[in-house]
Amino acid sequence: MPVINIEDLTEKDKLKMEVDQLKKEVTLERMLVSKCCEEVRDYVEERSGEDPLVKGIPEDKNPFKELKGGCVIS
């Protein structure tokens, strides 16, 4: 999709673009924020058992676990 410099457009072209955008937006299905928040919360809660950020990563499968041992020179 080409980049359009709005400053180079005529007023008629700007208004046409605005009308086109509004036509697209009017067809969008809208939902109440409260309903969406409930659905997102339910989705997260259903999958929280599988989420490594919630339940953690088992030590044997943690790729970032610090290696044991080493040498300290004083």
UniProtKB/Swiss-Prot annotation:
Superkingdom of the source species: Eukaryota
Bilayer topology term: Lipid-anchor
SMART domains attached to this UniProt entry: G_gamma, GGL
Key words, A-Z: Cell membrane, Lipoprotein, Membrane, Methylation, Prenylation, Transducer
Modified residues (Cysteine methyl ester): C71
Coiled-coil ranges from the UniProt annotation: none
GO BP, sorted A to Z: cardiac muscle cell apoptotic process; cellular response to hypoxia; eye photoreceptor cell development; G protein-coupled receptor signaling pathway; phototransduction; protein localization; signal transduction
Main location group: membrane
Residues carrying lipid (S-farnesyl cysteine): C71
Gene3D superfamilies, alphabetized: Transducin (heterotrimeric G protein), gamma chain
One GO CC term on file: photoreceptor disc membrane
Propeptide positions: 72-74
UniProt cross-references to InterPro entries, sorted A to Z: G-protein_gamma-like_dom (IPR015898), GGL_sf (IPR036284), Gprotein-gamma (IPR001770)
GO MF annotation: an example: GTPase activity
CDD domains, sorted: GGL (cd00068)
Record localization: Cell membrane
Tissue: Retinal rod outer segment.
Family designation: Belongs to the G protein gamma family.
Biological function: Guanine nucleotide-binding proteins (G proteins) are involved as a modulator or transducer in various transmembrane signaling systems. The beta and gamma chains are required for the GTPase activity, for replacement of GDP by GTP, and for G protein-effector interaction.
Description of how the protein assembles with itself and partners: G proteins are composed of 3 units, alpha, beta and gamma.
Entry protein name: Guanine nucleotide-binding protein G(T) subunit gamma-T1
Gene: GNGT1
